[in-house]
Amino acid sequence: MPVLRSLLGGVFTHHPEQCLVTVNPHLGHPLSAGSAPFTLKDEHYFMALDDPQADVFMTTTSEHGEQPGAWRRVEGSGRLAVLTPGHNVEVWLHPSFQALLLNSLRWCGKLL
């Protein structure tokens, strides 16, 4: 397995043309605190999630289906989080996405 795929616990497979994508944080998950579902135009990434131990904390849905949109995992003594939305600035400016990103960074830094 390629090194980056092994590190991330999965790999990008494809995306359709940009469309309305709903980001669905898993309520009650610590990395989803302060976020709520929202829908914006984005690239809907389809992923092959290889790691059965990966902790999915957000899914994405569109007319093309549902996918794991964010997960976290431990690799050795390190932590990493993968978030697939964010190909348009409107996603980055959305308060719920900012909460997901900040929580992920805090968890990776062992502050959460």
Spans of features found by a protein language model:
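Extracellular ligand-binding/catalytic regions of CAZymes and related secreted enzymes
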Residues: G65, V74-L80, T84-L112
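An acidic, glycine-rich "communication" segment
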Residues: M1-S62
